[in-house]
């Protein structure tokens, strides 16, 4: 990938809180591995660059990687000057590239969901187009709509979540929220999911304090979430992952809000490793535990979380400091187990906050997500 440090006037200061900077034919991704100490954008010229950026954690967060993948291919086909195939050839090319991009990170359903939706656009375009350029144009426009829709979706999640939590909790004027990993502007096209709810609570004047975990081993909480909270001037405290239970015991947490990489039909949720531990602690201390995610994170094809494929990351992330980017800190020869995600069972989750509203349980332990999706299918995001 070409390297383009942020030293000119093209990218303004506030863009440091945008992981995706796109204009038709051009895509730059903020290298989140270097935050918060260095701001650097990488030029993404094609789907190969996009795959590498996602796999190597240049960009992360389920919504963000879906958008980045789609746009990396949009940039590639926009800049084609030597494609001589038919409309069907163009469709075949796009299908193969989308499958390739989906393989970059298998746990996040947003990526495969975006690919499937884009394939539908490609099918329709190829059936009526007279040339390859028309198919490529249809794809580019669809990818750009996804970028726009993600921002609107995130703001709706924030609004629904803030209203719901204020109505559910005691003393809603003095809320302290604990979150895990990074679910803000850097993990999405903008605003954020779980962190978007925290932003909305702060804007409403009811947030006393946000707590963010460091989120080892890649430190998305200490490097990214803390960075966003400081930038937004939201009162916040960083805690070690291992301090979360003690924080809850000391009655410092009103609710826990996390994001999601994949939600099964029954509500079981795959999210950053350590989420399950937080949910167990929250239940023990009678603290509500919420998942905030767009409906694109829901995978109705999976009946439960036992079917979710969990990505395992490089041992180097544990063996070396700075999530694998620094010097070795562990003994040579030690074996490593480094799952990127865990699955929190639905019985530990109080509600799932989406852009269409909050999914609550039909009884003590079960969510009827299929019915919620069906019931809100024609409902606009607001």
Swiss-Prot record:
UniProt enzyme class: isomerase
The reaction(s) this protein catalyses: 5-(methylsulfanyl)-alpha-D-ribose 1-phosphate = 5-(methylsulfanyl)-D-ribulose 1-phosphate
Amino-acid biosynthesis is among the record's keywords: yes
Domain of life: Eukaryota
GO biological process: L-methionine salvage from methylthioadenosine
Pathway listed: Amino-acid biosynthesis; L-methionine biosynthesis via salvage pathway; L-methionine from S-methyl-5-thio-alpha-D-ribose 1-phosphate: step 1/6
GO cellular component term of the entry, any: cytoplasm
InterPro entries reported in the protein's UniProt record: IF-2B-related, IF-M1Pi, IF_2B-like_C, Initiation_fac_2B_a/b/d, M1Pi_N, NagB/RpiA_transferase-like
Compartments (UniProt record): Cytoplasm; Nucleus
Active-site residues annotated for this sequence: 261 (proton donor)
Keywords: Amino-acid biosynthesis, Cytoplasm, Isomerase, Methionine biosynthesis, Nucleus
Primary localisation category: cytoplasm
Molecular-function annotations in GO: S-methyl-5-thioribose-1-phosphate isomerase activity
EC number(s) per entry: 5.3.1.23
Residues annotated as site: Transition state stabilizer: 181
NCBIfam families from the UniProt entry: eIF-2B_rel, PRK05720.1, salvage_mtnA
Family: Belongs to the eIF-2B alpha/beta/delta subunits family. MtnA subfamily.
Function: Catalyzes the interconversion of methylthioribose-1-phosphate (MTR-1-P) into methylthioribulose-1-phosphate (MTRu-1-P).
Name this protein carries in UniProt: Methylthioribose-1-phosphate isomerase
Organism: Ricinus communis
Biological classification of the source: Eukaryota, Viridiplantae, Streptophyta, Embryophyta, Tracheophyta
